UniProtKB/Swiss-Prot annotation:
Purpose of the protein: Involved in gametogenesis and steroidogenesis.
Gene name tied to this protein: cgbb
Sugar attachment sites: 34
Organism encoding this protein: Clupea pallasii
Residues making up the signal peptide according to the UniProt record: 1-24
Subunit annotation: Heterodimer of an alpha and a beta chain.
Any one biological process term the GO annotation gives: G protein-coupled receptor signaling pathway
Keywords: Disulfide bond, Glycoprotein, Hormone, Secreted, Signal
Disulphide bridges: 30-78, 44-93, 47-131, 55-109, 59-111, 114-121
Listed Pfam families: Cys_knot
GO molecular function: hormone activity
UniProt name for this protein: Gonadotropin subunit beta-2
């Protein structure tokens, strides 16, 4: 019986792994998710934490084998398709500080280029509910309106 070299077996295993589509790795597609986020502002001593809808998940992407200095690689990210803006009032702000903060709420998601107008396009950022000041929890059903203060 002919002996198969170890490098041939290794090559076959690598080819099998590369041939497996991304769906087999249980990568969540780009979808709407409910997420706890925080808002804070200089001059307001508390960080307001609440739940809202954001986009999260995996987008198919291609990485070229040959990278030319003249080619442009556009990576698609999971971002807002449609959205609306909501405004929330931060409590206990100093005199002269506008207590209103406006933020986007995702209505639909899509895989497209990242827009700095609505998204954090950094490679690695802080968690969405990160606070530098004292946390003031507000839950989805208790989110204050503009007129609660």
């Amino acid at each position: 019986m002919a002996r198969i070299p170890e490098c041939t077996i290794l090559l076959l295993l690598c080819m099998c792994v590369l041939a497996v589509p991304a769906q087999c790795f249980n990568l969540q597609p780009c979808v709407l998710v409910n997420e706890t986020v925080s808002v804070e502002k200089e001059g307001c001593p508390r960080c307001l934490v609440f739940r809202t809808t954001i986009c999260s998940g995996h987008c198919p992407t291609k990485e070229p084998v040959y990278k030319s200095p003249f080619s442009v690689v556009n990576q698609h990210v999971c971002t807002y398709g449609n959205f609306r803006y909501e405004t929330i009032r931060l409590p206990d702000c100093a005199d002269g500080v506008d207590p209103l903060v406006t933020y986007p709420v995702a209505l639909s998601c899509e895989c497209s280029l990242c827009s700095m107008d609505t998204s954090d396009c950094t490679i690695e950022s802080v968690e969405p509910d990160f606070c530098m000041s004292q946390r003031l929890p507000v839950y989805e059903s208790q989110k204050p309106s503009l007129y609660d203060y």
